[in-house]
Curated annotation (Swiss-Prot):
Keywords assigned by UniProt, alphabetized: Cell wall, Disulfide bond, Secreted
Signal peptide start-end: none
Descriptive protein name: Thaumatin-like protein 5
Cellular component per GO, a single term: extracellular region
Subcellular location field: Secreted; Secreted, Cell wall
Organism: Taxus baccata (English yew)
Family: Belongs to the thaumatin family.
Amino acid sequence: NACSSDLNSK
């Protein structure tokens, strides 16, 4: 599962 930091990076 993608981390919240990964989602924020987009």
